[in-house]
Amino acid sequence: MWISMNGQLYKEEQAVVSVYDHGFLYGLGLFETFRTYAGKPFLLQEHLLRLTEGCKELGIAYEPNMERIAEQISKLLEVNELQDAYIRLSVSAGVDILGLPGGLYEQPNEIIYIKSLPPRDEAVYSQGKALQLLKLPRNTPEGLYRFKSFHYMNNILAKRELQNYRWSAGAEGLMLTEEGYLAEGIVSNLFFVKNDVICTPSLDTGILPGITRSYVLQLAEANGFSTQDGLYRWEDLLQSDEIFIVNSVQEIVPITSLYTPDGQKYLVSHGSIGPIARGLIELYKTT
């Protein structure tokens, strides 16, 4: 595959960064993942805004130009012979001394990765998937709020735990906070419906302020749905009428069963997709 590094296209085996890049040494870097539709990156402005704000917090001098990024993505689609793709835009701090940083990073590295979108499993959107409760808690944010940073060990350990549950193949893993509140999935934000109100964990839990999470809330409110964020527990999920998860690539995925770490299974909405989730999926398709 071809990728973009600092505005230039390279074959993936030719694109390298220094061993003194603080993204490699200390995990000082941020990234955004999103997809294209008809060759156009979806919600690019929102992703770049989050990326820019995070870079400011980390002292990384990076202010992306949306038109330039969109053009690079278009070139990558063309050279890789893809109509649409999964995109990862990464910004690492750049080269500095071996030691804890303190100053401004003025020469960050920008890397745009691209790969084919996973095949769309229509059965998931018509029948739903499972959500597995994990023992591993969600770690606390690195700063005042959670960055989409290179620090991904918590998610990787969660993925390893999920793979140990033989009954939950294909499921998403759900993490709680240390205090036992609902947090988020390994690669998704969580929603549930109770009494026709769409609920989602508050950002006060330390979850990622997901771009698709925000978009779905706006989409729901614009179409007359009631929404609410707050501090919720596992029992709230068990008593919910519907559950769904969201991310930028999978969009809105309905959940029709829950599993505990000891393998106990609970059906959601009698094992079928609820009307609100189904309606939001259709609305998302048409935007």
For the regions a language model picked out, list residue spans one by one.
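Helix-start/capping segments and mature chain N-termini
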Residues: 1-75, 92, 98-287
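Ordered, amphipathic secondary-structure segments that act as subunit-interaction surfaces
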Residues: 78-91, 98
